[in-house]
């Protein structure tokens, strides 16, 4: 038996080495995996276009207005001056107010300045408006918090402004608006914004149903647990819990609550997480979409104890709540029923099938471990806090292969 066990362990090590070989090749010199991708073609924004395509002060963009900052405010210390020599500040007030901004805004602006010089040699980024202390903007403008800038190029060539907008998006601004023929408006999330800390998770208080019918808080799930999930056709089944993509018991975040009335259910999850909704044009009748896209009148799939199948139920209302702790469980089938509502195990990218395919190595390793070590202690619950390394790696690979528009706006913050 010892010989067979050692052979199994040796086979596992060889298999893992084969899995990791492509990753090593990608980091090394030469051709193949390590070959540098051709720079993607950047598309200029159209006049009056804004990215992301939501209102500026919403969760998916720069977040809510938090109050005007004056020189006498306690929050004035949040503003730091930007003396980057590669940026021209108009400073028509002669107070250096335009140079004051939050750290996040400064970081994005400095990144954009480099992009501008690389794209148009000899041209610099120009800031016409930054922090405003004189009340020249609309009420609740993010200029009053040092979270917004209006920009042009140093040569004031209006034909460049569409591309300048695109470069600002690529630089990581949370909201970019080709606002006028005279400038581009860019803004960022607040430094302490709960929105800036949102990925794709459920609160720890959310519950799942185990194979024996009992309920269990998501935060207490352990490897070896079997929970209710569904296949691609929406049939309810029991699936193995494999791991947490994200495991954060302490951070306070903002969640979207999707509420139905008949029967009454509440699914609480972050904006970038995928949930299944009714779609008559899809072959299975359902499709996965970001929680932030769900609206009253849409239908979600609800499981009731009295029946074995999922029921299509109309969403009554959508609202937000803050909770402490967030967890993103992964099952062997890539789906999970949380608080009686069917959701995906994945987030950030709006394609459930792609995400599930990307986690195939994780599922395979789980099966191998079960086969190689059948006598190992079940219900192992140790996992370090934070985003799992495999998930983090996939995100960075995806960001290299796909356009930023392929990701949920909040998911892009992982790159910031």
Swiss-Prot record:
Subunit structure, interactors included: Interacts with HHATL/GUP1 which negatively regulates HHAT-mediated palmitoylation of the TWHH N-terminus. Interacts with BOC and CDON. Interacts with HHIP. Interacts with DISP1 via its cholesterol anchor. Interacts with SCUBE2.
Tissue: Expressed in the ventral midline of the neural tube and brain. In the developing brain, expression occurs in domains that include a discrete region in the floor of the diencephalon. Not detected in the notochord or developing fin bud.
Marked site positions, Essential for auto-cleavage: 273
The UniProt record lists the keyword Cell membrane: yes
GO biological process: cell fate specification; cell-cell signaling; embryonic neurocranium morphogenesis; embryonic viscerocranium morphogenesis; endocardial cell differentiation; forebrain development; gliogenesis; neuron differentiation
Record has Cytoplasm as a keyword: no
SUPFAM superfamilies per the UniProt record, alphabetical: Hedgehog/DD-peptidase (SSF55166), Hedgehog/intein (Hint) domain (SSF51294)
EC number: 3.1.-.-
Binding site for Ca(2+) 1: 92-93, 98, 128-129
Chain sites annotated for binding Ca(2+) 2: 93, 129, 132, 134
Protein name: Tiggy-winkle hedgehog protein
Lineage: Eukaryota, Metazoa, Chordata, Craniata, Vertebrata
Lipid-modified residues, Cholesterol glycine ester kind: 200
Keywords from the named record: Autocatalytic cleavage, Calcium, Cell membrane, Developmental protein, Endoplasmic reticulum, Golgi apparatus, Hydrolase, Lipoprotein, Membrane, Metal-binding, Palmitate, Protease, Signal, Transferase, Zinc
Site location (Involved in auto-cleavage): 270
């Amino acid at each position: 038996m010892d010989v067979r066990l050692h052979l199994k362990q040796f086979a596992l090590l060889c298999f893992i080495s084969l899995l990791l070989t492509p990753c090593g090749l990608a980091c090394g010199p030469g051709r193949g995996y390590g070959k540098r991708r051709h720079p993607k073609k950047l598309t200029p924004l159209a006049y009056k276009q804004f990215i992301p395509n939501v209102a500026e002060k919403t969760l998916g963009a720069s977040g809510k207005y938090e109050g005007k900052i004056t020189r006498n405010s306690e929050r004035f210390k949040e503003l730091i001056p930007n003396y980057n020599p590669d940026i021209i500040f108009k400073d028509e007030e002669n107070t250096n107010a335009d140079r004051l901004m939050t750290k996040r805004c400064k970081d994005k602006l400095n990144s954009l300045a480099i992009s501008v010089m690389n794209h148009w040699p000899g041209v610099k980024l120009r800031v016409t408006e930054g922090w405003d202390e004189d009340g020249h903007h609309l009420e609740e403008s993010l200029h009053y918090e040092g979270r917004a800038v209006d920009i042009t190029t140093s040569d004031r060539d209006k034909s460049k402004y569409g591309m300048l907008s695109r470069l600002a998006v690529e630089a990581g601004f949370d909201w970019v608006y080709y606002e006028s023929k005279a400038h581009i408006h860019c803004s960022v999330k607040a430094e302490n914004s709960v929105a800036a800390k949102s990925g794709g998770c459920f609160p720890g208080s959310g519950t799942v149903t185990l194979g024996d019918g009992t309920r269990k808080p998501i935060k207490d799930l352990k490897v070896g647990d079997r929970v209710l999930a569904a296949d691609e056709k929406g049939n309810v089944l029991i699936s193995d819990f494999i791991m947490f993509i994200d495991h954060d018991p302490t951070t306070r975040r903002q969640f979207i609550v999707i509420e139905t009335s008949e029967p009454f259910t509440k699914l609480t999850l972050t904006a970038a997480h995928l949930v299944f909704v009714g779609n008559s044009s899809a072959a299975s009748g359902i499709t996965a979409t970001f929680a932030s896209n769900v609206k009253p009148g849409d239908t979600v799939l609800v499981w009731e104890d009295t029946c074995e199948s999922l029921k299509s139920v109309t969403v009554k209302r959508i609202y937000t709540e803050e909770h402490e702790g967030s967890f993103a469980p992964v099952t062997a089938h890539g789906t999970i029923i949380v608080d009686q509502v069917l959701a995906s195990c994945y987030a950030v990218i709006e394609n459930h099938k792609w995400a599930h395919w990307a986690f195939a190595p994780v599922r395979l390793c789980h099966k191998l471990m079960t086969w190689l070590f059948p006598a190992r202690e079940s219900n192992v619950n140790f996992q370090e806090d934070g985003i799992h390394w495999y998930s983090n790696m996939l995100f960075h690979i995806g960001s290299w292969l796909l356009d930023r528009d392929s990701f949920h706006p909040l998911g892009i913050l992982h790159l910031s």
